[in-house]
């Protein structure tokens, strides 16, 4: 966008306020570079960036960025062979520390805000490199001011020698200054330093009493700073040690600089990301100060700013107005009194668009909508008196000519007092002609004017809407309220009456104006009244909509909570049912053991009623509501003895042995016979006779040691296998042969997997060639 536009709209002041919120020179640099983008995707992304950080900033305490500085110059110097000093290394260390703290904060944030996504910040955190080793190397080698003594073995030895030598020098000099004989010869009984040498202050007249080197004298010349000869050699030794220390420090710093150079790319990424975060946090801080909101950007041309206000004005006193280009409206003409807020409205619209396209939240209520403009053109200036018409008019017209050269359908054009500064009739004609031209170009236009001719401009042109700033006749002052769709009317008669002008004069003046103009003023007055009524209703409607949305949100949350509660109850019921089934399964195992014992005790003579009594113990463990399937009354023909049925509550097949009455029947399920409700039975359709049918007899002599499952469907084969194994166990068989055939191998695999889980099977193997080979599985029973 043109710099002139940004200057007129005072965007630099906004940037200055954002800059005040930055912590580092990195963030400050990015604020100074901040400009409105014109690419739709870029504008949307910048706004998403700011809004995401603002959401986090408004809910959480962000880690401090204090001490973050620009270090790219140090990194580049390290890369070309320069040596960094301790201060520069500490700034690099602080960069790493800040990024690590932000990483930790983000990880905690993700854990706390479970389900909330921060995709942009997540991407930035993923960009941050791991620099733990470099941080530790710097941190363990130096503090804020100097290298640690133990930074190297050599440095520690040198500094130890310096310390011990200094101590000897001090002891020597202390004896001199504390000597009673020397008290009157010294200016002060202290040891001081001159030119990095330990000296004592001697009065000039006693110079001959002290052997040594004079290093300095006082301004008056009355005190000489003498290095006694007794410590000259020790001071020389200190100088040599200081030189050795400097060489060792240079070596250590060179080594650390090498580590920095090795991580140069990672450090530059860290600097870039943290600088961007400082910039975004500054935007978020400023946005909160103006209670900024996130606009929705539209591909088509849209401007809707609910209760917008100028961010540079005092928020406590400024009047917020809704600025809107309604559907199919391309031009808005604002009329009204001087100092009524027309110019502020233009600047508010222009500045908000510039802010939004720079990624700043805007000072409006929620729900604002904007399109992205390639450029914003302004002709806004202070009003001048008619005596300055030539300079004022020429200045405005020069600017307008420049605007008309460059404006297009992607532009927003703001005209303040269009056509002002010349003859009113010519100015009004020019204003209408200029507006026609800009509308033909396709630009979106908002213009302010004094000319009454422009009030009628919208009535014979499509896409043009009037607006006005309200004037309070009672207080004789503007209210600064913007009335969209209502042209401004003249208040001269009302103001004059309020100020005490004679009614005769006012009434005579009214007869001098045309009937049409009088009717227009009355129409405008009626429009103002209707606008206020509609605006009041709209505000009430907005309030009701918000209340409805809140109720909807509350109900949605309650419904979700109810669903979660219902789900938890179902899960709890399932868990209880599973526990019951587990207990029932164990009970079934006990029944089988009891049956074995009965068989051993009574041989093959196991009475039916004993078996049913044992099974009844299993039935008692099932609760119909918790583990039964959804039972529906059978829809087939009437069930009679001999029918094959499915027992719904157990999901098992059976055969009806006897109909006890209209409600109950005795059913044989495998080796178990039970009395069941008829409504719990579902009649099975007759199937073709299979080669092998289920074994129902329990005599050991009639149960074969082999089961032929060839021709069975997968599910039926497993049911048949279960029944057979139960009977084989009761017959005390140790080994049985399951014939499944070779085929595709699916039945073989299913049989063997089932045997692996069956509690009565201790082992199984494939058949030997003499036993049938791969078409047979041999199972060993427990």
Swiss-Prot record:
<comment type="function">
    <text>Acts as a ribosome collision sensor, splitting the ribosome into its 2 subunits. Detects stalled/collided 70S ribosomes which it binds and splits by an ATP-hydrolysis driven conformational change. Acts upstream of the ribosome quality control system (RQC), a ribosome-associated complex that mediates the extraction of incompletely synthesized nascent chains from stalled ribosomes and their subsequent degradation. Probably generates substrates for RQC.</text>
</comment>
<dbReference type="InterPro" id="IPR045076">
    <property type="entry name" value="MutS"/>
</dbReference>
<dbReference type="InterPro" id="IPR007696">
    <property type="entry name" value="DNA_mismatch_repair_MutS_core"/>
</dbReference>
<comment type="function">
    <text>Endonuclease that is involved in the suppression of homologous recombination and thus may have a key role in the control of bacterial genetic diversity.</text>
</comment>
<protein>
    <recommendedName>
        <fullName>Endonuclease MutS2</fullName>
        <ecNumber>3.1.-.-</ecNumber>
        <ecNumber>3.6.4.-</ecNumber>
    </recommendedName>
</protein>
<dbReference type="GO" id="GO:0005524">
    <property type="term" value="F:ATP binding"/>
</dbReference>
<dbReference type="InterPro" id="IPR005747">
    <property type="entry name" value="MutS2"/>
</dbReference>
<comment type="similarity">
    <text>Belongs to the DNA mismatch repair MutS family. MutS2 subfamily.</text>
</comment>
<dbReference type="InterPro" id="IPR036063">
    <property type="entry name" value="Smr_dom_sf"/>
</dbReference>
<comment type="subunit">
    <text>Homodimer. Binds to stalled ribosomes, contacting rRNA.</text>
</comment>
<keyword id="KW-0378">Hydrolase</keyword>
<dbReference type="GO" id="GO:0140664">
    <property type="term" value="F:ATP-dependent DNA damage sensor activity"/>
</dbReference>
<dbReference type="GO" id="GO:0043023">
    <property type="term" value="F:ribosomal large subunit binding"/>
</dbReference>
<keyword id="KW-0540">Nuclease</keyword>
<dbReference type="Pfam" id="PF20297">
    <property type="entry name" value="MSSS"/>
</dbReference>
<dbReference type="GO" id="GO:0072344">
    <property type="term" value="P:rescue of stalled ribosome"/>
</dbReference>
<dbReference type="GO" id="GO:0004519">
    <property type="term" value="F:endonuclease activity"/>
</dbReference>
<keyword id="KW-0255">Endonuclease</keyword>
<dbReference type="GO" id="GO:0030983">
    <property type="term" value="F:mismatched DNA binding"/>
</dbReference>
<dbReference type="InterPro" id="IPR027417">
    <property type="entry name" value="P-loop_NTPase"/>
</dbReference>
<dbReference type="GO" id="GO:0003690">
    <property type="term" value="F:double-stranded DNA binding"/>
</dbReference>
<dbReference type="GO" id="GO:0006298">
    <property type="term" value="P:mismatch repair"/>
</dbReference>
<keyword id="KW-0699">rRNA-binding</keyword>
<feature type="domain" description="Smr">
    <location>
        <begin position="707"/>
        <end position="782"/>
    </location>
</feature>
<keyword id="KW-0067">ATP-binding</keyword>
<keyword id="KW-0694">RNA-binding</keyword>
<dbReference type="InterPro" id="IPR046893">
    <property type="entry name" value="MSSS"/>
</dbReference>
<dbReference type="Pfam" id="PF00488">
    <property type="entry name" value="MutS_V"/>
</dbReference>
<dbReference type="GO" id="GO:0019843">
    <property type="term" value="F:rRNA binding"/>
</dbReference>
<dbReference type="GO" id="GO:0016887">
    <property type="term" value="F:ATP hydrolysis activity"/>
</dbReference>
<keyword id="KW-0238">DNA-binding</keyword>
<dbReference type="GO" id="GO:0045910">
    <property type="term" value="P:negative regulation of DNA recombination"/>
</dbReference>
<dbReference type="InterPro" id="IPR002625">
    <property type="entry name" value="Smr_dom"/>
</dbReference>
<keyword id="KW-0547">Nucleotide-binding</keyword>
<dbReference type="InterPro" id="IPR036187">
    <property type="entry name" value="DNA_mismatch_repair_MutS_sf"/>
</dbReference>
<feature type="binding site">
    <location>
        <begin position="336"/>
        <end position="343"/>
    </location>
    <ligand>
        <name>ATP</name>
    </ligand>
</feature>
<dbReference type="Pfam" id="PF01713">
    <property type="entry name" value="Smr"/>
</dbReference>
<dbReference type="InterPro" id="IPR000432">
    <property type="entry name" value="DNA_mismatch_repair_MutS_C"/>
</dbReference>
């Amino acid at each position: 966008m043109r710099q002139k536009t940004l200057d007129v709209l005072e965007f630099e002041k906004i940037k200055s306020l954002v800059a005040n919120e930055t912590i580092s020179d990195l963030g400050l640099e990015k604020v100074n570079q901040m400009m409105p983008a014109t690419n739709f995707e870029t504008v949307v992304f910048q706004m998403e960036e700011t809004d995401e950080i603002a959401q986090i900033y408004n809910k959480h305490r962000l880690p401090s960025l204090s001490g973050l500085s620009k270090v790219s110059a140090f990194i580049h110097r390290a890369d070309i062979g320069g040596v960094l000093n301790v201060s520069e290394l500490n700034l690099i260390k602080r960069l790493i520390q800040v990024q690590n703290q932000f990483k930790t904060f983000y990880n905690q944030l993700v854990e706390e805000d479970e389900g909330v996504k921060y995709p942009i910040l997540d991407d930035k955190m993923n960009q941050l490199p791991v620099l733990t080793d470099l941080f530790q190397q710097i941190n363990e080698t130096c503090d804020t001011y100097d290298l640690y003594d133990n930074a190297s073995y050599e440095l520690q030895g040198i500094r130890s020698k310096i310390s011990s030598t200094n101590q000897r020098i001090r002891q020597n000099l202390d004896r001199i200054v504390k000597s009673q004989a020397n008290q009157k010869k010294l200016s002060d009984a202290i040891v001081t330093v001159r030119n990095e040498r330990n000296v004592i202050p001697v009065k000039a007249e006693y110079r001959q009493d002290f052997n040594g080197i004079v290093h300095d004298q006082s301004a008056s010349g009355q005190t000489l700073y003498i290095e006694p000869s007794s410590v000259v050699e020790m001071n020389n030794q200190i100088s040599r040690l200081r030189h050795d220390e400097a060489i060792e420090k240079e070596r250590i710093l060179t080594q650390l600089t090498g580590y920095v150079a090795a991580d140069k790319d990672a450090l530059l990424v860290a600097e870039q990301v943290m600088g961007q975060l400082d910039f975004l946090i500054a935007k978020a801080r400023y946005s909160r100060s103006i209670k900024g909101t996130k606009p929705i950007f539209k591909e088509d041309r849209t401007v809707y700013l609910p209760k917008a206000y100028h961010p540079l004005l005092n928020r406590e006193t400024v009047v917020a107005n809704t600025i809107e280009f309604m559907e199919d409206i391309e031009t808005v003409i604002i009329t009204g009194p001087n100092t009524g807020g027309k110019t502020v409205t233009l600047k508010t619209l222009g500045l908000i668009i510039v802010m939004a396209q720079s990624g700043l939240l805007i000072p409006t209520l929620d729900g604002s909508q904007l399109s992205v403009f390639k450029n914003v053109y302004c002709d806004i200036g202070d009003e001048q008196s008619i005596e300055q018409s030539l300079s004022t008019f020429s200045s405005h017209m020069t600017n307008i000519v420049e605007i008309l050269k460059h404006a297009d359908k992607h532009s927003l054009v703001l005209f303040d007092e269009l056509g002002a500064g010349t003859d009113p009739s010519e100015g009004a004609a020019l204003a209408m002609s200029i507006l026609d031209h800009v509308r033909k170009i396709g630009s979106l236009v908002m213009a302010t004017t004094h000319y009454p001719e422009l009030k009628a401009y919208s009535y014979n042109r499509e896409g043009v809407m009037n607006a006005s700033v309200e004037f309070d006749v009672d207080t004789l002052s503007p209210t600064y309220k913007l009335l969209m769709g209502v042209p401004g009317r003249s208040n001269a008669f009302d103001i004059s009456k309020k100020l005490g002008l004679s009614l005769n004069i006012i009434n005579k003046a009214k007869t001098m104006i045309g009937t049409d103009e009088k009717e227009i003023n009355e129409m405008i007055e009626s429009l103002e009244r209707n606008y206020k009524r509609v605006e009041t209703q709209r505000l009430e409607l907005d309030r009701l909509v918000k209340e409805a949305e809140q109720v909807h949100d509350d109900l949605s949350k309650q419904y979700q909570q109810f669903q979660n509660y219902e789900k938890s109850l179902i899960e709890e019921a399932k868990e209880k049912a599973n526990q019951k089934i587990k207990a029932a399964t164990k009970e079934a195992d006990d029944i089988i053991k009891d049956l074995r014992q009965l068989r051993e005790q009574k041989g093959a003579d196991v009475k039916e009623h004993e078996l049913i009594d044992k099974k009844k113990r299993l039935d008692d463990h099932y609760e119909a509501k918790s583990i039964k399937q959804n039972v529906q009354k059978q829809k087939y023909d009437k069930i009679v003895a001999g029918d094959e049925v499915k027992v719904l509550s157990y999901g098992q097949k059976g055969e009806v042995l006897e109909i006890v009455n209209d409600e109950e029947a005795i059913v044989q399920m495998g080796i178990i016979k039970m009395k069941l409700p008829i409504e719990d039975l579902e009649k099975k359709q007759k199937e073709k006779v299979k080669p092998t049918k289920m074994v129902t007899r329990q005599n050991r002599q009639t149960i074969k040691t082999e089961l032929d499952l060839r021709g069975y469907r997968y599910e039926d084969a497993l049911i048949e296998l279960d029944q057979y194994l139960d009977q084989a166990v009761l017959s005390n068989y140790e080994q049985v042969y399951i014939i499944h055939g070779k085929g595709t191998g699916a039945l073989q695999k299913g049989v063997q997997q089932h045997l692996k889980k069956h509690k009565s099977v201790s082992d199984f193997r494939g058949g030997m060639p003499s036993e049938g080979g791969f078409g047979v599985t041999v199972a060993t029973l427990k």
